[in-house]
């Protein structure tokens, strides 16, 4: 008679995570002939970084970056502070110069799903992501020039256009494995001519 009650939130599994488990994993095993299921590349984390160099002059700018990153990622970002003082940039040690959020687990899957299906198609004159920005170990980093491509950001309420860097960290050993994983997840890479 003991019955476990499941909350509705515990049943919801991100769409991309389900796709990875159901079809992408088996496709990668066939393509790269893995002997062990643990060799299959998987996502570790996604880091979204927003550098705000002008925050050295105006400290209010960092609040806008934190607000935007919170809306985009769904979690409160860490404020990045200057490690060294640099006189030419009028920068002192400990001054806020940016913000970053590290996404793992279901938040990471949800963010990538929104990025690939909603945000990237909204970029003007978008021809695909460059396939050359892998770091040699299967991790991929790319930059976005403005934050308004995310539908969580209200275009009328932004104080200034801010770009961001997004790094996708995988367990892939080579760039080819990482590229195959991200392509299967729906990343629109340019076809190299």
UniProtKB/Swiss-Prot annotation:
<dbReference type="InterPro" id="IPR031309">
    <property type="entry name" value="Ribosomal_uL5_C"/>
</dbReference>
<dbReference type="GO" id="GO:0006412">
    <property type="term" value="P:translation"/>
</dbReference>
<dbReference type="InterPro" id="IPR022803">
    <property type="entry name" value="Ribosomal_uL5_dom_sf"/>
</dbReference>
<keyword id="KW-0820">tRNA-binding</keyword>
<dbReference type="Pfam" id="PF00673">
    <property type="entry name" value="Ribosomal_L5_C"/>
</dbReference>
<keyword id="KW-0694">RNA-binding</keyword>
<dbReference type="InterPro" id="IPR031310">
    <property type="entry name" value="Ribosomal_uL5_N"/>
</dbReference>
<dbReference type="GO" id="GO:0005840">
    <property type="term" value="C:ribosome"/>
</dbReference>
<dbReference type="Pfam" id="PF00281">
    <property type="entry name" value="Ribosomal_L5"/>
</dbReference>
<protein>
    <recommendedName>
        <fullName>Large ribosomal subunit protein uL5</fullName>
    </recommendedName>
</protein>
<dbReference type="InterPro" id="IPR002132">
    <property type="entry name" value="Ribosomal_uL5"/>
</dbReference>
<dbReference type="GO" id="GO:0003735">
    <property type="term" value="F:structural constituent of ribosome"/>
</dbReference>
<comment type="subunit">
    <text>Part of the 50S ribosomal subunit; part of the 5S rRNA/L5/L18/L25 subcomplex. Contacts the 5S rRNA and the P site tRNA. Forms a bridge to the 30S subunit in the 70S ribosome.</text>
</comment>
<dbReference type="GO" id="GO:0000049">
    <property type="term" value="F:tRNA binding"/>
</dbReference>
<comment type="function">
    <text>This is one of the proteins that bind and probably mediate the attachment of the 5S RNA into the large ribosomal subunit, where it forms part of the central protuberance. In the 70S ribosome it contacts protein S13 of the 30S subunit (bridge B1b), connecting the 2 subunits; this bridge is implicated in subunit movement. Contacts the P site tRNA; the 5S rRNA and some of its associated proteins might help stabilize positioning of ribosome-bound tRNAs.</text>
</comment>
<keyword id="KW-0699">rRNA-binding</keyword>
<dbReference type="InterPro" id="IPR020930">
    <property type="entry name" value="Ribosomal_uL5_bac-type"/>
</dbReference>
<dbReference type="GO" id="GO:1990904">
    <property type="term" value="C:ribonucleoprotein complex"/>
</dbReference>
<comment type="similarity">
    <text>Belongs to the universal ribosomal protein uL5 family.</text>
</comment>
<keyword id="KW-0689">Ribosomal protein</keyword>
<dbReference type="GO" id="GO:0019843">
    <property type="term" value="F:rRNA binding"/>
</dbReference>
<keyword id="KW-0687">Ribonucleoprotein</keyword>
């Amino acid at each position: 008679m003991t019955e476990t009650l499941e909350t509705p939130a515990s049943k919801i599994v991100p769409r991309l995570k389900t796709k990875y488990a159901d079809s992408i994993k088996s496709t990668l095993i066939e393509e790269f002939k893995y002997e062990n299921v643990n060799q299959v590349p998987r996502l570790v984390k996604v880091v979204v970084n927003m550098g705000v160099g002008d925050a050295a002059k105006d400290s209010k700018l960092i609040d806008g970056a934190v607000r935007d990153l919170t809306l985009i990622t769904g979690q409160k970002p860490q404020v990045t502070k200057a490690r060294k003082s640099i006189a030419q940039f009028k920068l002192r040690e400990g001054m806020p110069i940016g913000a970053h959020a590290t996404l793992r687990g279901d938040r990471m899957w949800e963010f990538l799903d929104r990025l690939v299906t909603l945000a990237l198609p909204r970029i003007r004159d978008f021809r695909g992501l460059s396939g050359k920005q892998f770091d040699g170990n299967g991790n991929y980093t790319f930059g976005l020039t403005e934050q308004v491509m995310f539908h969580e950001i209200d275009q009328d309420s932004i104080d200034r256009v801010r770009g961001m860097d997004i790094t996708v960290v995988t367990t892939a050993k080579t760039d080819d494995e990482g590229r195959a994983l991200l392509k299967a997840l729906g990343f629109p890479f340019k076809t190299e001519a």
